[in-house]
Amino acid sequence: MRPILLAGHERSLNQIKFNRDGDLLFSVAKDKIVCAWWSANGERLGTYSGHLGAIWTVDVSPNTVLLATGSADNSVRLWNVKTGECVKVWEFPTAVKRVEFSPDGSKVLAVTEKRMGFLGTIAVLDINYDGDFTNQAEEPSLRITCTESKATVAGWSYLGKYIIAGHEDGSVSQYDAKTGEQLENVQAHEFDHQINDLQFSPDRTHFLTASKDKSAKLMSSRNLAILKTYVADTPLNSAAITPKKEYVILGGGQAAMDVTTTSARQGKFEARFYHKVFEDEIGRVKGHFGPLNTIHVHPAGTAYASGGEDGYVRVHHFDKPYFDFMYEVEREQLRR
């Protein structure tokens, strides 16, 4: 599995995303620009510039027409994917740490930071696809305020029915996406170990969280039941579910300030593959010189990409052995 190395950023990566078709990959870092790449060969298509601070988060609409980004300049920007122009800017009182389009692309949620007397919020913005896309609503259609512990990540469940959020204190909440009412709150991870990532399965019925407490949890979107736990030996920054095969990929590594030796092995900067059902670690992929900050899997399950503290994005297209590998139990099932 030879990786394609994408060097388009000068600073560490914050988030990467494939589009729904999987032919494009978008990456954002602390250097104020968004890069768009062909995922097949790693060729850079172009950049989207306009933000005035580090960009924390990116997401692309299901039809690959619009791109949303959230930044430390306290704004969410909406971009025309094709032309690269910024069609709308929404200003917030604090930095925006996570954006995500709803499954039908009609809304975008934005998670804002708790700072300077402002509480952390989850704002929902309605998206209009008419004309040149500039005619967008000024105000959020819904605002959820996190009074207890601020949300660090959030996403939409199946059919956009619930908004699921991961918090700084290690808990996961479920909100009604129409009213904003909190329906459920579960202490999924160790108290005060924040949740760094939350990614859904393709059908959005379950999701995976990655936390500073060195574990990832597979949870149900309907009732927040913890279905599986994957234990690692390093704080986790990102976790993704692979379609096609029953695996999960976890990424992390010691924070830069905690690393005492520079050996890549020492810092545990590998992508780890676990079996989704049996919770066993089945392999690792080395490469990054520094912690992995973000992982995203190709929607067809044929590749995955990781972005690191080292400023590189690595795209791995899976080889045949990856698809052939099976547990004895799985082989038995096939024979029946």
From Swiss-Prot:
<dbReference type="GO" id="GO:0034399">
    <property type="term" value="C:nuclear periphery"/>
</dbReference>
<dbReference type="InterPro" id="IPR015943">
    <property type="entry name" value="WD40/YVTN_repeat-like_dom_sf"/>
</dbReference>
<dbReference type="GO" id="GO:0002183">
    <property type="term" value="P:cytoplasmic translational initiation"/>
</dbReference>
<feature type="repeat" description="WD 3">
    <location>
        <begin position="146"/>
        <end position="185"/>
    </location>
</feature>
<dbReference type="GO" id="GO:0071541">
    <property type="term" value="C:eukaryotic translation initiation factor 3 complex, eIF3m"/>
</dbReference>
<feature type="repeat" description="WD 5">
    <location>
        <begin position="287"/>
        <end position="326"/>
    </location>
</feature>
<dbReference type="Pfam" id="PF24805">
    <property type="entry name" value="EIF3I"/>
</dbReference>
<comment type="similarity">
    <text>Belongs to the eIF-3 subunit I family.</text>
</comment>
<dbReference type="GO" id="GO:0033290">
    <property type="term" value="C:eukaryotic 48S preinitiation complex"/>
</dbReference>
<protein>
    <recommendedName>
        <fullName>Eukaryotic translation initiation factor 3 subunit I</fullName>
    </recommendedName>
</protein>
<dbReference type="GO" id="GO:0016282">
    <property type="term" value="C:eukaryotic 43S preinitiation complex"/>
</dbReference>
<keyword id="KW-0677">Repeat</keyword>
<dbReference type="GO" id="GO:0003743">
    <property type="term" value="F:translation initiation factor activity"/>
</dbReference>
<dbReference type="InterPro" id="IPR036322">
    <property type="entry name" value="WD40_repeat_dom_sf"/>
</dbReference>
<feature type="repeat" description="WD 1">
    <location>
        <begin position="8"/>
        <end position="47"/>
    </location>
</feature>
<keyword id="KW-0648">Protein biosynthesis</keyword>
<dbReference type="GO" id="GO:0001732">
    <property type="term" value="P:formation of cytoplasmic translation initiation complex"/>
</dbReference>
<dbReference type="GO" id="GO:0003723">
    <property type="term" value="F:RNA binding"/>
</dbReference>
<feature type="repeat" description="WD 2">
    <location>
        <begin position="50"/>
        <end position="91"/>
    </location>
</feature>
<dbReference type="GO" id="GO:0071540">
    <property type="term" value="C:eukaryotic translation initiation factor 3 complex, eIF3e"/>
</dbReference>
<dbReference type="InterPro" id="IPR001680">
    <property type="entry name" value="WD40_rpt"/>
</dbReference>
<keyword id="KW-0396">Initiation factor</keyword>
<comment type="subunit">
    <text>Component of the eukaryotic translation initiation factor 3 (eIF-3) complex.</text>
</comment>
<feature type="repeat" description="WD 4">
    <location>
        <begin position="190"/>
        <end position="229"/>
    </location>
</feature>
<keyword id="KW-0963">Cytoplasm</keyword>
<keyword id="KW-0853">WD repeat</keyword>
<comment type="function">
    <text>Component of the eukaryotic translation initiation factor 3 (eIF-3) complex, which is involved in protein synthesis of a specialized repertoire of mRNAs and, together with other initiation factors, stimulates binding of mRNA and methionyl-tRNAi to the 40S ribosome. The eIF-3 complex specifically targets and initiates translation of a subset of mRNAs involved in cell proliferation.</text>
</comment>
<dbReference type="InterPro" id="IPR019775">
    <property type="entry name" value="WD40_repeat_CS"/>
</dbReference>
<dbReference type="InterPro" id="IPR027525">
    <property type="entry name" value="eIF3i"/>
</dbReference>
